[in-house]
Amino acid sequence: MQKRVKVKPNSKQQKIAEQDDGSLTVHLKSPPVDGKANEELIKLLAEKFDVPKSHITIKSGLSSKQKLIEIETDI
């Protein structure tokens, strides 16, 4: 499953909001430095979709706020 994700780093609280078009807006506490925001994003998405962190891959947008995420599900 692929999801478009808009990341908002340096937020006061962690939050995942699903948009009408099926994309996600994810608020992260971590700054976008040394991959910390990406690590936090993967951890949050793994918890939301109940999959191991190793099943989540950032396909594009590694250094961008707009990302394409691949989530491997066991379905």
UniProtKB/Swiss-Prot annotation:
Family matches, as InterPro entries: DUF167, YggU-like_sf
GO cellular component: cytoplasm
Gene3D superfamilies: YggU-like
Residues covered by region (Disordered): 1-32
NCBIfam families: DUF167 family protein
UniProt family annotation: Belongs to the UPF0235 family.
Name of the protein in question: UPF0235 protein asl3196
Lineage summary: Bacteria, Bacillati, Cyanobacteriota, Cyanophyceae, Nostocales
